[in-house]
Structures are given as structure tokens and as C-alpha cells.
Amino acid sequence: MKNIVLTGFMATGKTTVGKKVATNMSFGFIDTDKMIEKMANMTVSDIFEKYGEDYFRRLEKAAVIKAARLKNFVIATGGGVVLNPSNIVQLRKNGVVICFVARPEIILRNIGKNKDRPLLMVDNPEEKIRQLLKEREPFYRFADYTIDVSDMTIDEVAEEVIKAYIRLKKG
């Protein structure tokens, strides 16, 4: 069966929902950011700090190629995976791409005090979120299905993902 690929902005619940969906569907689960951390033997934040975003995006592309070869998996991607169109092409070969969106204030609340968000290490994180969302919005349109998770529970989002997947894998 095709993979379920979860994309969308950081802190929209891709990993949390992905694990739940994988359990409910008896699929494997993989997170591309965790794959990158394993490849580099350091955290995403440390990669950004030491080597910069370009290096991280190269590692991300390698992780996507590896993840896209899997079958019967839920793949949670990093928030910027959509910035490289070839990543989406790879993931779509054997996957249904579902994008999570949320209002900026919800994203900021979800991030809370988490300091592991290198792109948000700025004076005004909410403004940075708005800017990044605006920049990435055209890329998010390439998803097969989009879910606004702003006012949904984890269980509701997981249920919506499964329903969308069942509908879309037929097409």
C-alpha cells in the first residue's frame, strides 16, 4: 500500500499524529528529521548552528529519497521539506501527501518554550512564523489533501488523515 506522507509547518502535529495513524493503520512510522539527526549524529538545531540551512537541506533530500522507498509507512516530514520540489516528487511516487496547516498563534502555542526550532530563534517568533507561512504557502498547495488542524484534537486529525488516505489511495 502507498505511504501516508505528512507535510506542513513545524509544530502542526505531524509526528504526534503520524505515530497515532501508523498504529491505527498497522503501518511503520518514520520521521525525516530523526533520520537526519541519525545521519549527522547531531540534533537538527546543532546541524543548523554548525553547518547552516543549506547543509541541512542536502541531508533532508537524502533522507527523503530513503524514506520514499519504504512501503506501508507513515512518513512525518520536516516543516521545510516542501521547499525542494524534488522532495515532493519523490514522496508522491509511492505516497499520498497530506499537509497540515494551522493559524500562526496556534503554531506559536504548540512550540511553547521549545528551543529546538532554529528558524524561530528571533526576537519576534510569531512574525517569523507569519513570514515563513507566507513563503511556503505556494509549496503546500502540492499536497493531495490539506487539513487545518488549528481547532482539532490529535484524535480528530488522525481520523481525518485516515479518511483522506482511504479516499485518495483509490485515485
Curated annotation (Swiss-Prot):
Q: In which pathway does it act?
A: Metabolic intermediate biosynthesis; chorismate biosynthesis; chorismate from D-erythrose 4-phosphate and phosphoenolpyruvate: step 5/7
- GO molecular function, one example? shikimate kinase activity
Q: Where does ATP bind?
A: A11, T12, G13, K14, T15, T16, R117
Q: Does the keyword Kinase apply?
A: yes
Provide the GO biological process annotations.
amino acid biosynthetic process; aromatic amino acid family biosynthetic process; chorismate biosynthetic process
Q: Does the keyword Metal-binding apply?
A: yes
Q: Which domain of life, per UniProt?
A: Bacteria
Question: Looking at its record, which EC class is this enzyme?
Answer: transferase
- Which reaction does this enzyme catalyse, per its entry? shikimate + ATP = 3-phosphoshikimate + ADP + H(+)
Q: What's the cofactor?
A: Mg(2+)
Q: Which residues are Mg(2+)-binding?
A: T15
Keywords from the UniProt entry: Amino-acid biosynthesis, Aromatic amino acid biosynthesis, ATP-binding, Cytoplasm, Kinase, Magnesium, Metal-binding, Nucleotide-binding, Transferase
Looking at the UniProt record for this protein, which Gene Ontology cellular component terms does it annotate, in alphabetical order?
Answer: cytosol
What family is it from?
A: Belongs to the shikimate kinase family.
Q: NCBIfam families, alphabetically?
A: PRK13947.1
PANTHER family this protein is in? SHIKIMATE KINASE (PTHR21087), SHIKIMATE KINASE 1, CHLOROPLASTIC (PTHR21087:SF16)
Function description: Catalyzes the specific phosphorylation of the 3-hydroxyl group of shikimic acid using ATP as a cosubstrate.
- Subunit notes for this chain? Monomer.
Quote the protein name from its UniProt record: Shikimate kinase
Q: Which organism is it from?
A: Thermoanaerobacter pseudethanolicus (strain ATCC 33223 / 39E) (Clostridium thermohydrosulfuricum)
